């Protein structure tokens, strides 16, 4: 499962980007893909693992879990 670091995440808008550890292009992340209960958000520089899915706008992180 790919891992990366949260580049930025806007909690008000519910989305942001993850920089994958392998150096590939940043991946879009939507709050609905963050695993867990309650308020789902990510912090800048937080380490995460995720799968890569595809949306009409390109690659998107799915099943995002904090490490």
Swiss-Prot record:
Which InterPro entries has this protein been placed in? Answer: Cold_shock_CspA, Cold_shock_domain, CSD, CSD_CS, CSP_DNA-bd, NA-bd_OB-fold
| Residues annotated as signal peptide | none
What SMART domains does this protein map onto? CSP (SM00357)
| Cellular-component GO terms for this entry | cytoplasm; peptidoglycan-based cell wall
Location relative to the cell: Cytoplasm
- What is one process in the GO biological process aspect for this record? regulation of gene expression
For molecular function, the Gene Ontology terms on record are: DNA binding; nucleic acid binding
Domain of life of the organism encoding this protein: Bacteria
Keywords in alphabetical order, please: Activator, Cytoplasm, DNA-binding, Transcription, Transcription regulation
Q: Which cysteines are joined by disulfide bonds?
A: none
List each copy of the CSD domain by range: 4-64
Q: Pfam families from the entry? A: CSD
**Name listed for the protein in its UniProt record:** Probable cold shock protein A
């Amino acid at each position: 499962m790919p891992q990366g670091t949260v580049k930025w995440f806007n909690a008000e808008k519910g989305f942001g980007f993850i920089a994958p550890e392998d150096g590939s292009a940043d991946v879009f992340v939507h709050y609905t893909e963050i695993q867990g209960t309650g308020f789902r958000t990510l912090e800048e520089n937080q380490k995460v693992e995720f799968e890569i899915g595809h949306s009409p706008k390109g690659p998107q992180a799915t099943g995002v879990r904090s490490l």
